[in-house]
Amino acid sequence: MDCALALVARGRPVREVCFVLGVSRSHMTALRTRKADWVDRRKAPPRPDDDQLLSDIITVAKDLPTYGYRRVWAILKFQGIDGSPRMVNHKRVYRVMRDNNLLLFRHGSKPRDTRRHDGKVAVQTSNTRWCSDGFELACDNGEKVRVAFALDCCDREVMSWVATTKGIDAGLVGDLMMQAVEYRFGAGSTAQTPIEWLSDNGSCYTAIETRTFAKQLGLKPVRTPVESPQSNGMAESFVKTFKRDYARLANRPDSQTVMRELKLWFEHYNEKHPHSALGYLPPRRFREKQRSIN
């Protein structure tokens, strides 16, 4: 800009100089007509004090060390510390965590999964499709706890779960389905309209007793293609989240301890776990929002 001003002062045309040097003509005119005693009184906005925010972030990170900056931000915004939500921008949370080395370690790019699934498991309304799957948790003493759960494919709430140190059989899956139906519609009730019950091809799900009982409850059994676990991707994703954010961080000395902790873990997931697909709201808060809109 100084070069452009010098050329114009020597008599060069303003339009020609601005075009050749690529500067703004309006800016050039403003500088040429500015008074000699002009003082730039513009000031940068005051930088917010990050000490309290950093303290709140550390408090969240201590309890939930697997949460990235987005979920930390969601906890602060929607739940807050001691129940007091904090209005803060997610970019500011990222900056504070970055400057204080609190961001999670970024893993390298994962190899592309060749087991592609082009279908869509998620649905727009609750009680349209439920998915179910099971997983295993190993204890320090060698015992294993096997867990099965029922998850709504819209609001992501875990409606029911069962656990055992033995295998998941048709009887336990029947209990799982009945608990889910009674949780959503009341004791002794059945689904008002058929609800898809999505599962894999495990023997406990394909058993005649399971399919018959599901239909009695108003559920419509739907199974994934053989050797296609990605077709039940929502349940698979939940298992990954549950193990990463809860099971791996906890002491698991024996099966009795794990059985006691499972209830707390599922409750925390439903009440407080921010979900990206739900606008970073926990499942139950998302359901409350749904009901208020409808």
Regions found by a protein language model. Give the residues of each.
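Charged DNA-binding/catalytic regions of mobile-element recombinases
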Residues: 1-294
